[in-house]
């Protein structure tokens, strides 16, 4: 028999869990740049960044699901679902959804990545309640009807065809496959013609129910927003939908993942009749939680992050071998990529690859000059600040930070971390990352003799 005091204690404990928890994560001056987080009963997190001086606001909902979470048979399901959430809810048609935001001059969109999905709307601050209502309705009330699945299949197949027609885009999918193979990280976010054709409404509904629980979601809003008002409206929308049914549920922790990069030295070529050959030479990089990522950012900027970078100067400015040449990094939960892209005439592929490989090897052995590091630090700091000048970028930053790291970092702290990078830090990460044996992906009209020599670039 349960005692009265025990029952009261249990009720008190349950009520305590049901109370929303609010924290100030970054305290801005005079409220400008203040970031707050509220965790609702049911595990839904809401983060906001307040900028009273602007007239706009961006509202988004991030889902802890990407193409990495798909089985081979479900490849493309995350992106397919992203499309379907715009097709109608219990109270809005697809036209109602789009016209609501169009009517106030706003913009609305979504994107799917390998480890997350985001739906967002950018509007005037006075129209923020509308944006919240529409986006929350999409996430909690979508119908995912058979006829919509059939119609949207055609649009997605055209999107796949459009990507295939752009070798400069397609080569990045090829490089992911070169590095990760048939692992989910190596498969295209859009899926393939075969997998998209095989997906059914029932399978997509099951995928939706599994991955769009409130514990898997992060709500983010930035601009001229009132945190408490955003929380009240979001909570009302999710409670009305019945989504917050378990008050004791806790938010999903940031993804841990598992290392999946394949052995180095792989070469993949897709022969295609194009004017240019598109190449990516790269190797395993750093996970997004790796503390060396700040030094890696400086290294990447100096190597191929701008017109003064080594690769741009050597490949384009001095020799005119390519119009587009750059380096980039991609960080996932447990692994990463570093790549160098170039588009060039097929006859000059080997020259371009040799120059790029020589530069990577030289920097791996000798590092960068102090002047290069200083310039890269300044460039990275400036681009970081300039990249956060609109509310959409701010919403992306706080939403992704909450989902992927479970914490927030102020812009000042980010700039300080970049400034703290030393030449020794850069040399160490260059030896580690650039010292690894590279792999190579190529799309273009290479002849047999040219193709047979591609392995020289990764030897």
Swiss-Prot record:
Catalytic site positions: 82 (proton acceptor)
Catalytic activity, EC: 3.4.24.-
GO biological-process terms attached to the record: proteolysis
Cofactor(s) it depends on: Zn(2+)
Molecular function as annotated in GO: metal ion binding; metalloendopeptidase activity
Pfam families for the chain: Peptidase_M16 (PF00675), Peptidase_M16_C (PF05193)
Residues the entry annotates as binding Zn(2+): 79, 83, 159
Cofactor binding comment, as recorded: Binds 1 zinc ion per subunit.
Keywords (A to Z) from UniProt: Hydrolase, Metal-binding, Metalloprotease, Protease, Zinc
Keyword Protease: yes
Leading EC class: hydrolase
The family this protein is said to belong to: Belongs to the peptidase M16 family.
Name of this chain's protein: Uncharacterized zinc protease SCO5738
Native source species: Streptomyces coelicolor (strain ATCC BAA-471 / A3(2) / M145)
